[in-house]
Amino acid sequence: MREYLLPTRVVDGNKIENADTLLRSKGLYATINYNAEEWKSYLKMEGVGSFIILDFGKEMNGGIRMITNGIKYDSCKLRIRFGESLGEVSVNIKEKNANNVHGPRDFETLVCSYADVTMGKTGFRFVRIDLLEDRFVYFKNIFCENRILSKKPIYTYQGKDERIAKIFEVAKRTVDLCASEGYVWDGVKRDRLLWAGDLAPEIMALNSIYGRLPVVERSLDLAKKLAPIPKFMNGIYTYSMWWIIILADYYKEFNCEKYIKKQLSYLVELLDLLDGMVDENGELNREIRYLVDWPTKGSVDELVGVRAIFLMAMNGAVELLNAFGLSTEKAMKIREKILKQPLLAQEKKQVIALKYFATGELTDAEYNKLTEGGVKGFSTFMSYYVLSAIASRDEKLAIELMKEYYGAMLDRGATTFWEDFHIEWLEGSGRIDEIDPTKKDLHGDYGDHCYVGFRHSLCHGWSAGVVKFIKEHCHN
């Protein structure tokens, strides 16, 4: 669905008049105005150094629709910046890793008199517009053009806990934005791409909220199409394993025989390929790229996590092959090889949780590691698995930890959930919708790996796996 939304506030500006007039609609069309009195109901920007920062209130996916009136000399040059946080919209390219990756979010453009023009296609909440010439320009309105999934849900949280209700609402918005344009993306700023492994928690959320959706099947089919055997999905062999896990869960949930039958020949070929990723002694291939999640990257537990994902995938493959009367010999053989090496996680909570999902086992020592330090060590990608593993022993504690972890993002201004978040980032930092020079920038001063600073996505679909946890454990 495409919708047009007004800004909710004017954050800042210079050399501007009538800025608050942008907060009310004067129509989605351009008009010629010869009455100077009417110009008082339009934003006026005049001269080099004139700028305005608008807040649209929530994370959006799209751009801005600018409706202009009179402009001195009929056209003028503007600089437009989009930001998921107020910090991001206020800096220059390269500053704290601000960039134009996956979509331009900081650029110069030309606007003309009496025009109705849309600019940008990215993820944002804030927009800054700078006038770059010694001219004036009148804006009748500046709308956000937002694209968001609009389907009737089969599930919404109806309980009385306001914190859980807000977490559900924000997680739903996160995945609604990421699934709004035909495929399920990682994020709406970045990555505007389909990553097969990252689909797992996103599809959990979509299945929980809406049931069976065409956008999910299109995305699974595209992942397969882009990785003909002998390629792995996204060049990462664990991501091909996640495709199997998703497929097995999808069949269990919807009993969609016709759809699954179309995947079986690829699945059989993929098993032959995956067989080469583990030798007869259970040692994993380390030459081809693998990933558990970013906080696990390079840790002592990373390969244990790969092994757990491998086992989950083979469990799923056996279930699918059995259901359709096909040989399970290859999947069983791979599973036997994987189990020749112990699944012993030393420190990472997400790896302990994956091991629990792979084997159904959780020792007292592992449970103690899961709960030690509260939400320290949580990751948004693996939130469903970690919270569910804790809930297998103590559901009430798991719910409280969910409220603490996701609630902390809400308390700092989140309107969608983030690519990553560590509770330690809260110390000495501010909100994403404010700039406080006495505090660290929660967006620009943190991050890791490929999401350092303002490259960090504040609307990342993999964070929405918490929806399934809420549906399963936070009963109405």
Question: For each of these PLM feature ranges, what is it?
Answer:
Residues R24, Y29, Y34-E37, H102, ...:
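Alpha-helical structural elements
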Residues V188-R190, L194:
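Glycine/proline-enriched, intrinsically flexible loops and inter-domain linkers
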Residues N92-K94, L193, R455:
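A subset of signal/propeptide-processing and intrinsically disordered low-complexity segments
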Residues W195-P201, A205-N476:
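Active-site core of glycosidic bond-cleaving carbohydrate-active enzymes
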Residues F56, V117, R192, L206, ...:
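Short, charged/polar micro-motifs that form catalytic or ligand-binding hotspots
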Residues M1-V184, G197, P214-L220, K258, ...:
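Extracellular/oxidizing-compartment recognition motifs
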Residues P153-K160, K189, M204-A205, V300:
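Second-shell loop/turn segments in exported
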